Design a protein with these regions (language model features):
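Structured-RNA-binding interfaces characteristic of tRNA pseudouridine synthases
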Residues: 3-4, 14, 19-329
């Protein structure tokens, strides 16, 4: 069992609850629950990525669709002059995000062939990295190609035992609700606009019931034919914050989440805030294991940060604040 790193800024003391073993979920290139080091002659490149999910059909590459993963791999193949092209690259992500879902701290890794020469007219500064990859230049080149909907916040060469998915100790999502009478065009696509007044105190009370080891079948999309799939998860923290100007932010942390789990929980909690459900109905709904029908839209959901054991953590702090998730002055 991995120990948790320090929780993101603003997280409560419940972040220090240890995470027990739970099924790991997310999109990867293999279904085997183990870490594979890079093949000989390749290095493991790690990236911390932010993106606007409403511009893509999720992160997993899909033929004929514009996805975060597909666009990122194409850019990497060009920047690194990958001999085998984009087909020689496979992306492993810390957390799968569906269509419309954003990310601020998505961590990915990809095994690449170090370029024999340099980028552009100048050679790589091989003194920086023995592997011959100038990560600062890779970051600049990628951002020049991927803006404005994708931003690469950091690039480094990861140790071979690092895996963006399986090495993670926790994942933290943030959901933004705009609770105002009129919409805000500057938060469109980044929040769920709810016009009815919400009782934040009862929403906080209800959210506490999600903490712990539970079967979240009532709050998850049923797994599609995945052998050994389970809806049991361990939630270590939940938190609602009123940031002002009607912007409410819900954060939830766990080792792993099942599909649509966060959106289902937020939809349920907003119903509690509207007075349609009681704060005490969470455990009753869990026990029934019947999927409830209040699913929050994807617009407000963001993969906020991912934690790793200290020896495997990316050098870039993953907790931070994107301008799009703060109330405007």
């Amino acid at each position: 069992m991995s120990e948790l790193r320090e929780a993101p800024s603003g997280a409560s003391r419940r972040d220090r609850v240890p995470v027990t073993a739970a099924p790991r979920v997310g999109w990867v290139t293999t279904q085997e629950d183990r870490i594979r080091p890079p093949f000989s002659g390749r290095v493991r490149l790690r990236l911390v990525v932010a993106y606007r999910g409403d511009a893509f059909h999720g992160i997993s590459p899909q033929p004929g669709l514009r996805t975060v993963g597909g666009v990122l791999l194409e850019a990497l193949a060009k920047v690194l002059r990958e001999p085998g092209g984009v087909d020689a690259l496979a992306l492993v992500v810390s957390g799968r995000t569906d269509a419309g879902v954003h990310a601020w701290g998505q961590v990915v890794h990809v095994d690449v062939t170090p370029p024999a020469g340099g980028l552009g007219r100048e050679p790589f500064d091989t003194a920086r990295l023995a592997q011959g990859i100038d990560c600062a230049r890779v970051e600049r080149s990628l951002n020049g190609m991927l803006a404005p909907h994708i931003a690469v916040r950091g690039v480094d060469v990861a140790p071979p035992e690092f895996d963006a998915r399986f090495s993670a100790s926790w994942r933290r999502y943030r959901y933004t609700v705009l609770n105002t009478r009129t919409p805000d065009p500057f938060l469109a696509g980044l929040s769920w606009h709810v016009t009815e007044p919400l009782d934040l105190s009862v929403m906080r009370l209800a959210s506490d019931a999600f903490i712990g080891d539970h079967d979240f079948a009532a709050f998850c999309r049923a797994p599609d034919g995945v052998e050994g799939a389970t809806t049991k998860r361990v939630v270590t923290d939940t938190n609602w914050e009123d940031t002002g100007s009607g912007v409410l932010q819900f954060e939830i942390q766990a080792l792993a989440f099942c599909q649509q789990m966060v959106r289902s929980i937020v939809g349920f909690l907003v119903d509690v805030g509207r007075g349609r459900r009681s704060a005490g109905s969470v455990l009753e709904t869990m026990a029934a294991r019947k999927r409830h029908n209040s699913l929050a839209p994807s617009d407000g959901l963001c993969l906020w940060s991912v934690g790793y054991p200290t020896q495997l953590a990316p050098p870039l702090p993953l907790a931070g604040s994107g301008a799009g998730w703060r109330p405007l002055p």
